[in-house]
Amino acid sequence: MKAIVYRKNGPPDVLTCEEIEKPVPNDQEVLIKVHAAAVNPLDYHMMKGGPAIFRLLFGRAELKRPGVDCAGVVEAVGPAVTLFKAGDAVFGTCRGAFAEYAIVPQSSLAPKPDNVPFEDAAACPVAALTALQGLRKHGKIQPGQNVLINGASGGVGTFAIQLAKIFGAQVTAVCSVCNAVLVRSLGADHVIDYAQEDFSTGTARYDLILDLAGNHPFSVCQRVLTPRGIHVGAGVLAGEKSLSAMFGGLIGALLRSRFSSQKFVVFMAKVNREDLTSVGELVASGKLKPVIDRRYTLVEVPEAMRYQGTWRARGKLVIGLDA
């Protein structure tokens, strides 16, 4: 099968499309024929070998296969798999999604609704679950709250705007002026152009700040949080930060939070079948719409990763494998 691989960390030029052996599923695993995949910041950081936290967690590259988000059709299942069978259309997360076939744990998959295209389904897993869990589980969002989304026009942000509106919140989106029309079309009630205004110095107060840019520390955001407001960080790994700077900032924020009625939470999304199914149902109903900026083929993955590295994508970058 064809797959994107790399043997050393570096820029997108380290990626190559090669013929490798088709994998075989273990007990709890599913082999899917990949119809579409999507690019995440995680893929870019792992390829580059930075920020430093990724070198600590994943080590240096030997032979690695990028890609996490996937959607496709089940080709084979392991002997202990009970939830899926050959021929089922599914979406979820795996390692090595930028390939014609991928192995996926059955716990990281959900059925793909019939009316949802594979590319739309592939755009959802990491980004939509980050938005959902950041708002609902960690941000404890409630109807009528004022919610600010910093980094609102990216993959997670475009889902977060829509989900916050579904939850009944008033949404302020922070993005560049060229993305104002997009975020308003997704439901944002107010838009702040970060080049013209710093939300942390404004007069508005927010019950929840979902920070996807990682450029406003908790100590700064406290000024615009309500007395029991919550600052949820899901973009703290942005940029080439050293381990000492990264952990120093997190420890400082968590200590401030512990002795304040205002709270700081940092998290990484946990993929699970229940949340994936909920997202799939929302997309199928038309209440939640994946925003796809650009589409690429498998051999164009280096180009997609290069664009990801500009941090200017509006929504998601999708890799199509149906051609």
Task: Label every PLM stretch briefly.
Residues C94-Q106:
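A structural motif shared across PLP-dependent enzymes of the aminotransferase-like
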Residues T201-L208:
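A short acidic, Gly/Pro-enriched loop at the edge of an enzyme's catalytic core
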Residues H216-L288, L321-A323:
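Glycine-rich phosphate-binding loop and adjacent beta-alpha segment
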Residues K85, D114-P117, K140-N146:
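Short helix-loop-beta connector
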Residues M47, C70-C94, Q170:
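A glycine-/small-residue-rich N-terminal strand-loop-strand element
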Residues G280-E281, S285-R294, P302-A323:
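C-terminal capping/lid region of NAD(P)-dependent oxidoreductase domains
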Residues A122-D193:
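Mid-domain Rossmann-like dinucleotide-binding core that forms the NAD(H)/NADP(H) cofactor-binding site
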Residues P11, I20-A71:
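N-terminal glycine-rich beta->alpha transition that marks the start or flank
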